[in-house]
Amino acid sequence: KGEANGFFTALGVPTTFLQTTFYYEAFLQGQGPRRDDNGELVLSLPMADNKLALVAGEDIGKTALGVFRRGDDFIGKTVSIAGTHATGEQLAAMFTAALGEKVVYRPMTTDQMRASGQPGAVEVANMFQFYSDASEYFTGVRNLDLVRELNPELQPLDTWLTQHKDEIPLD
């Protein structure tokens, strides 16, 4: 992505760059809480106590539309989007509220994720390592007020979880 951005810039193409982040929908595809051997719901992500920026997939297009509607305002700029910034503990609390059952956060390391053997584990661990290593920058460039201005329908994660709670695989 970064390499392609350089081509647009070098050619002088009037461009706005849109940076996305971790999709809420990943929680529907195995990244959400799982029951441990004791039946407890556990959310394990390799993010320690850092904040993660997250967004609903459908909000990406709606935010891009908001950028287009502003005409030249964002040409040559980067718009980094998110709908929520949250720590692992905050994510677990949102899952608890949505599911009506206690979810605990147990961080794992990126090395543990890489070694998990899950499909795509190495790539996902690398992504989380970047998110974690650059957490302050990564969440800092994602101005939730600006994104909400561009997309008034922007969904915070807690709202999205409530709407999709029955789709989240827990076992």
Please report, for each region that a protein language model flagged, where it lies by residue.
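A hydrophobic C-terminal alpha-helical subdomain
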Residues: 110-171
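NAD(P)-dinucleotide binding in Rossmann-like oxidoreductases
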Residues: 106-108
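Oxidoreductase cofactor-interface core, primarily capturing Rossmann-like NAD(P)-dependent enzymes
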Residues: 1-104, 113-120
